[in-house]
Each structure stands twice: as C-alpha cells, then as structure tokens.
UniProtKB/Swiss-Prot annotation:
The gene is pepX. One of its GO terms (molecular function) is aminopeptidase activity. Its main location: cytoplasm. Homodimer. It is an enzyme of class 3 (hydrolase). It catalyses: Hydrolyzes Xaa-Pro-|- bonds to release unblocked, N-terminal dipeptides from substrates including Ala-Pro-|-p-nitroanilide and (sequentially) Tyr-Pro-|-Phe-Pro-|-Gly-Pro-|-Ile. InterPro entries: AB_hydrolase_fold, Galactose-bd-like_sf, Pept_S15_Xpro, PepX_N_dom, PepX_N_dom_sf, Xaa-Pro-like_dom, Xaa-Pro_dipept_C, Xaa-Pro_dipeptidyl-ppase/CocE. One of its GO terms (cellular component) is cytoplasm. This is Xaa-Pro dipeptidyl-peptidase. It comes from Streptococcus equi subsp. zooepidemicus (strain MGCS10565). Keywords: Aminopeptidase, Cytoplasm, Hydrolase, Protease, Serine protease. It comes from the Bacteria. Coiled coil: none annotated.
Length: 761
C-alpha cells in the first residue's frame, strides 16, 4: 500500500480539539502529549471495558508493549508514534514490515509527527485510511462509536455514517416529463426509485441516471447485432453539414391535483456502492432509467436531448418545478418535501454519459456530477474518423442495438402487446438515421453530441477515466474536459485501468474526497476543501498518483519513422480471415506478436518521453484502390512491470459503507511484468484524411499526405524503452472486416510521429 491522501483538510488546533472532543476523545490542549496519546488510544477500544487488554497486544518499541510503554517514563517519540499509528491502521509488525521508518517512507505515510502538535497528528490519523481501505474514523463509526440518530455529524469537513440504514424509506414516484417520445398524445412518465433515510431536515440527493436499471433485453440485443464482415464502400466526395441541435421540450403546467403520500414501494433495487456510502451519510439515493424503460412510458431515444430531458425532469421535480404522480393513473401528485433540491449524479459509462448530458442543460439544482468513463459524443463511441468503429469488446454493436438492450418496456408483456408494433417503427427509423453503411457524421449524431453545449455547464464536474478504456475511449473525456468553461470547478482522475470504477481502490481516497466535495457543495459545509484539477496515476510506479494541470501538453516532439517504403496488405487468406472474424482476440494477439498484415517500426528512446495528449502520425502513403482503412497502435514494447487494466481484489468485504452496511471489496490495479502495453491507438477512413466533415476521393496509386490523431493519453516512457509503432488496415475488434485485395504503401522517410509532451517549452 502507498498513501495518496487527497481528502484530509488541514485545520486549526482549536478545530481539531473540538472535533476530537465531539467524538468522545477527552483530550485537552493543556495535557502532556503522552497523556493525550493514551486517552486517544483507549478511546479507540470503546468496545472493551478493560482497555489494558487490547493495548497489551500492541507494541511501542522492540522492547515494550504499548500498555507498558504508557505506564513507563519513556518519552513519546516519532519512532513510537509511527509504530503505534501503523498498528492502529491495521499494519502488523513482522508481517507487513520490519523496519518502521523504512516502511513509513515506502508507503508515503502522510502524518509528520510533532510532539508539540500531537492533537493535530491524532486528528489526521482519524482521517487516514486503514490498510482495509476505510478511514480510521469511518471504521470506528461503523463499529458504533456514534449512534445512528439520523442527524448529520461531520469530521474534518466530511459527513459521518450516522443515518439509520436499517430503517430506510423506499418509494416510487412517476415524474411527468415535457416529452411525448412515443407519440401517444400524453406526456411521458418517468419512474423514479427513491431510497432515503428518515431525517428531520431537508436532504440532498445522489441520482444515478441508468437506462439499464429497470432491466435489459439481451435477447433483442443479440438479434440486432450487426454483421462486421463486409466491404468498405467508397463514398462520393462532399462536405458534410449539420445544424445546431434544436431540442424543444413540450409545454407543461403546474398540477392542481390533490397531494398524496407515496402509493408504491419496493424492497430492493441494485445499487451503486458509492451511493450506498452517501446514503449512510444523509443523502437520498435516486435510481432513474428514463424514457422507454420498464415502469416509464415513451420511446428509448438513446442519447439525445429528449432522453436527457427525462432525467432533467426529475431534478426539476426535486426543486418544485415539475409534477410527479403517485401512480400511472395520474390522479394524485406527490411533492419532494424531503429534498433540499441539490443533486449529485453518479455512475459509469452510459450512466456517466447521462450526467454529462444533464450538466450541459445547465439545470438548476444539479450541484455536482461524478461521471465515470462517460461518453461526450455518441458518434465517437460508435464511429471514428468516417468509419463504423465498434466499442472495444463489442463488435457489431451500434446505437440501435443499445436501444434494443435498454428498451425494457418490452420486458413487460402488457407493454409489449400494446406498444411493440409502434416501437418497431420508431426503431427502424433510428436504424436508418444512424447511417451505418457510410460511417458518416450527420444530424442524428450531432444531436447526440454534448460538446457544443459544454459552455452551458455550471455545476462542479468530476470525471474519472481509464487510459486503457477502449470501450468509452479516452478522447471522450479529453474533449469534454478541455471544452469546459473557464472558471468552472473541474476535476479529472485518470487511471491506467480499462472500463472500471475506482472508488474502492486502496491507493487513493476517492470516496472520502467526494465526501468533502459534496458536503461543501450540497450541505453548506465551509470546509475549505480543494480538489486538484487533474489527478493522474503514474504508470511507472505502483500506487502513485500525481497532480497535473492539463490534459494535453503544449510541447511537441518529432520522431522519425525510418527511410524505407513499406507495403501493408489488407487481404488475408480465407482460413486466417475466418479465424480472426470468429475471435478478434486472436487477431490482437498476433498483431502484437508481429504476425498479422502490418508494418512495425521500433523506436529506441534516447531520452525520457512524457506523453500528454493526442499523438499524431504525419504520413505519406498511397492505396492501390480508391478506398482504404488505416489503423495504428503505439506500444510500450518489451518486458517490464506495468499495470494490468482490471483491478484485483485485495480483500473481500473490507469496506463498510456505513454501520455494517453495503460492504464491498478493496481493490487495486496489479503492477506486474508484461511483454507490452498499448499506449494509444486509432482508426481512419482515408477518405476523411483532412477532417471528419470532408469526404475526399482516394486516387489509385497516388501519394497522399495525411494527419492522423490517435486517442489521447498521459503515459511516461523512460530512456532506453522501446516505442513500437504498428500500422495496419482492418482492425477485427473495431472496424468493418473488409477482406478485399488492396494494399497501402507508406513512405517512411517522408513520415513522422508527433508526440505531445508535458515538458515546458
């Protein structure tokens, strides 16, 4: 374990003492340091009437157990404090470490002992994570240090788990959205599952906008998958134009219906453990699936502003601007009189995507979005540079396939009976509008691009994204983060995992940092917390995070690619083509081994290379036909320690998100030997060699110069490392599988690689 403590808020001695005393630690500024230390330690063992017993099982020095030390005349030194603090945090001498000071250095222990400031040290110790992944104070509260009295209690600017999760209110309401997406003449109703603690004051909400949450139709999804094998068709040259998105919600009016209490409850809904964490700390949890999902009405419009409006309506209801009904009969309305109107949105992938879309509406009441692996442009999810480009791991998926997956109204037989025929008509229109045959950007995709609306965002923004996420690729967060308005509170966590959550990792106190931020923004805590702009996981060191100021360096380093002409054949023999089409992982493995149709350029680095941004290939090439796909990958090549891209479980159920509530596993990305690592990649239709909106002819056997931007990343390579450039045509994971007989020729002498770096110019 290594500490990267973001969440601790430096405080005054007076505040520290007051907070310690409020928790029952009977310390005083006038006490001798050793006396305060003893009082603090004995309080940790509040389950014991005889606290001598647990103290006797700890050590203070190599010669003295802790109980004997406290009774002795020995002084409290840094060595003693550090050794005892480590044990309090769950580290075991002679098991986890032998030399205390070496271990303190190794793990980046965040507390610097000062006998004159011991109470500040003890205050920070309570706010420091244990080996198990929870802070010491959260561990104590989970054991019953404070009662579950349904009142807010804070420590170091963060809410504690004092809300009773054994007696929660679970209710369902139906919010009226200003939409009629299924064209039935009635405004769409949106089902909202609410879980909230019993509180005497108005409380904020965590909202997860999840089209998956009311069920998914995998059978319909699988039937709708598109065939990847086919021939890349040349496109007529033209300039693509689109109009600004012009979504207009329908008119609504305040309801005059009588107000009633909830008429529908539920016992269980799958939850997100970050929401559970906040539920125990006095935040309501709302799960909303939006239009076209089971329990709601409407059509699944998949990514456009109509879908986003269905989630926005819920925030409007929480603030008294929209109507909710107790049932589909629409005969009683229900008020969110428990809500303080402030909302934070959470969730990964599609869920985080809806957070971004919501933020671009500028809706009042949305205080913070915590958007993980979020899409900012749906074109860039299902297309790339004029090509159909399946998200990593899901060849054949497209937006209409996702519609089939998430249109969970068809999982209700009555809804299927009444609405499926009309749904199929709307789905057919959607399938035509996405222009799978051409791969072009068009109005359909522009209406699902949130980047042009980024200047409307006014809430605090937190993004997390994996730099090995080839499902929702890094360009999604790169573009939205760099499009955010100046002066906005914005924060980005970049890790080296794939499409994964990171709130339960050992090496970073993400959960606690979000607690401090949300208490500041949603509970009026003037805690002085400041979250860095960019927190990046250092790819060269285990469990190490660094603060950066920008995603995208201003300096460029030009790297030559060679002197030869190289030929890349597109066509494979029938056996190989079938094998690769059946299992794209076999293609990837052989590509990285140099066994596919490809050009490989190995570059031995003569100095460190700190990549930050979009690497760019400047290439001179020609195609033997009037079409062509160019795919590229950059690899950190050669055996050495690197991060795996899926977090491993370190300890099951070690994280308690409340008081014996919603336990989850502690995880971390393994750091282990590997033969190579993908640094970045990309695909390009050569007819879009100038830009996305310009389609150009490809003249047979005539040289072209292209600019090819790869996915952005932040990745540091060291002097002596090998940067491998892999160039090829068809990518069996992502692109159309075109096995036609054409080839690309590259003039490497007239080509180069341009690397953005975070070096100062």
């Amino acid at each position: 374990m290594r500490y990267n403590q973001l969440s601790y808020i430096p405080t005054s001695l007076e505040t520290a003492v007051a907070e310690l005393q409020a928790l029952g630690f009977a310390v005083q500024q006038e006490q001798a340091p050793k006396e305060s230390f003893a009082i603090f330690l004995r309080k940790l063992f509040f389950h014991f009437q005889d606290t001598d017993y647990p103290l006797s099982h700890m050590i203070a020095t190599k010669e003295l157990d802790l109980l004997s030390f406290l009774a002795s005349d020995e002084a409290l030194t840094k060595e003693v404090f550090d050794l005892v603090a480590l044990q309090v945090l769950g580290f075991i001498p002679a098991v986890d470490f032998t030399d205390t000071q070496d271990f303190i250095q190794k793990i980046g222990f965040p507390i610097v002992f000062d006998s004159q400031q011991l109470l500040l040290n003890l205050h920070q110790l309570l706010a420091t994570r244990q080996k198990s992944g929870v802070t010491l104070i959260d561990s104590l509260v989970s054991q019953g240090l404070l009662p579950m009295d349904n009142c807010y209690h804070y420590f170091n600017g963060k809410a504690l788990a004092t809300f009773d999760t054994t007696s929660l209110i679970r209710e369902v309401v139906y919010v009226e959205a200003p939409l009629d997406t299924d064209q039935d003449g009635q405004l769409d109703l949106i089902k909202v599952n609410i879980i909230r603690p019993k509180a005497s004051t108005a409380i904020p909400s965590m909202m997860t906008a999840s089209p998956y949450h009311q069920g998914i139709n995998e059978t319909a999804n699988d039937k709708k998958l598109h065939r990847m094998e086919g021939e890349l068709s040349p496109k007529a040259p033209r300039r693509i134009t689109v109009e600004p998105t012009d979504f207009q919600p329908l008119a609504t009016k305040p309801s005059r219906l009588p107000v009633n209490e909830c008429q529908e409850t539920f016992s269980h809904i799958s939850s997100y453990t970050l929401n559970d964490y906040f539920l125990a700390r006095g935040f309501a949890n709302l799960y909303v699936s939006g239009v076209g999902t089971a329990g709601s009405t409407g059509f699944m419009t998949s990514g456009d502003y109509a879908q986003i409006e269905s989630f926005k309506a819920v925030i409007d209801w929480l603030n008294g601007r929209a109507t909710a009904y107790t049932s589909h009969k629409r005969d009683y309305q229900i008020k969110a009189d428990w809500s303080n109107g402030l909302v934070a949105t959470t969730g990964k992938s599609y869920l985080g995507t809806m957070s971004t879309g919501l933020a671009t509406t500028g809706v009042d009441g949305l205080a913070v979005i915590i958007a993980e692996a979020a899409i900012s442009s749906w074109y860039d999810y299902y297309r790339e540079n004029g090509l159909v480009c399946s998200p990593g791991g899901y060849p054949g998926e497209d937006l209409d396939v996702l519609t089939e997956l998430t249109y969970s109204r068809n999982l209700l037989p009555g809804d299927y009976l009444r609405h499926n025929d009309h749904y199929q008509q709307l789905l057919s229109q959607q399938s035509q509008a996405l222009e799978r045959q051409s791969g072009n950007y068009n109005q359909f995709w522009h209406d699902r691009n949130y980047l042009p609306q980024a200047d409307h965002i006014k809430c605090e923004v937190v993004y997390t994204h994996g730099l090995q996420d080839w499902n929702v690729k890094p360009r999604q967060v790169y573009n939205i983060f760099n499009a955010l308005p100046d002066g906005l509170g914005k924060h980005l966590f970049l890790h080296h995992g794939e499409h994964v959550y990171m709130h339960n990792w050992q090496s970073i106190d993400f959960r606690e940092a979000m607690n401090a931020l949300l208490c500041q923004k949603m509970l009026g805590q003037n805690n002085g917390f400041t979250l860095p702009t960019i927190i990046w996981q250092d790819n060269q060191k285990e469990q190490t995070w660094k603060e950066l100021t920008a995603f995208g360096g201003h300096s460029k380093r030009q790297i030559a690619l060679g002197e030869d002409h190289v030929l890349i054949d597109n066509h494979y023999g029938e056996e190989d083509f079938k094998r690769y089409s059946k299992d794209f992982r076999a293609f990837k493995a052989e590509l990285f081994e140099g066994k596919a149709n490809q050009a490989v350029i190995d570059i031995l680095l003569e100095e460190d290379l700190p990549i930050n941004g979009q690497a760019c290939l400047k290439l001179k090439l020609k195609s033997s036909e009037n079409k062509g796909i160019l795919s590229a990958q950059l690899l950190d090549y050669g055996k050495k320690k690197r991060f795996a891209d899926i977090p491993a479980i370190l300890e099951l159920d070690s994280i308690d998100n409340g008081q014996q509530f919603a336990r989850e596993a502690l995880k971390e990305l393994p750091f282990k030997d590997s033969p190579y690592r993908v640094v970045t990649k990309g695909v390009l239709n050569l007819q879009h060699r100038s830009n996305l909106l310009t389609i150009e002819d490809i003249p047979n056997d005539q040289w072209m110069t292209i600019t090819f931007h790869l996915q952005p990343t932040i990745y540091h390579m060291a002097k002596g490392d090998t940067l491998r450039v892999v160039l090829y045509t068809t990518d069996f994971e992502h692109t159309i599988r075109d096995n036609s007989n054409y080839a690309l020729t590259l003039d490497l002498e007239q080509s180069y690689l341009l690397i953005p770096t975070d070096e100062e110019e």
